[in-house]
Structures are given as structure tokens and as C-alpha cells.
Amino acid sequence: MNYQITPEQMEIYRAGARRRRQQEQERMVKKQQIGCQVAKEAAELLKREFGAQKIVIFGSMLKLEKLHDRSDLDLAVWGLNPRDYYRAVGKLLSLDPDILVDLVEVESAKPHILKVIEE
């Protein structure tokens, strides 16, 4: 049995790998665009329905090179009444079924989370 790969076979393999890498990159760009649109909708909703004062996106959705299939949308919120938190999260999760939203109340966030938000 001959297990050697010819240069032609190797080029076919490499071309396929390049094509898959390009498709993955395009998919992540689209995911980031959708995530940013959902973030805008979320900010409007939080301000309008819950009186939030400020909303900031942070985390992997901001950086294409860190974005992956399981990336969620991390939002920091100021001025949300703690009693409204779960109701707000429920509304945010209904904005797009493919984008999970992680809502962080800045006033009660742990220091290491605040550091990430500030970056």
C-alpha cells in the first residue's frame, strides 16, 4: 500500500482547508454583525422598558479574533432595578434565538468582571 501523498493531493487538501477557514471567518463576521444589532436593540429595550441608564457591550463579541461558536452577547447595565433583572433577561433572550445574552448588573458585579467591562 502506498501511503504517500502527492503534491497534487496535498494542494487539494490545502485548498479545502483554506476554503473552510474562509467560510468560518465569514460566519463569525456575520455572527458579530448580528450580535451588535441585538446589542443595540437590547440597549433600547432596557432603557425604554426598564429605565436603564447605560448599557455597554463587552467580551468576545467585540473582538472578531476571540469570537467562536459558543460566544454569547455580554452586556453590562447601569441603573436596572434588581427586581426587574429576570424579566429583563427574558425579554433580551427573545430578541434573537441564536444569540444568548448575558446581562451583568454593574452595581452588583464582582471586581474581576468590572475589570473586564472597563477594558
Feature locations, PLM:
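Catalytic core of pol beta-like nucleotidyltransferases
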Residues: 1-53, 63-69, 79-119
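Glycine-rich beta-strand-to-loop/alpha-helix junction loops that act as flexible
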Residues: 57-60
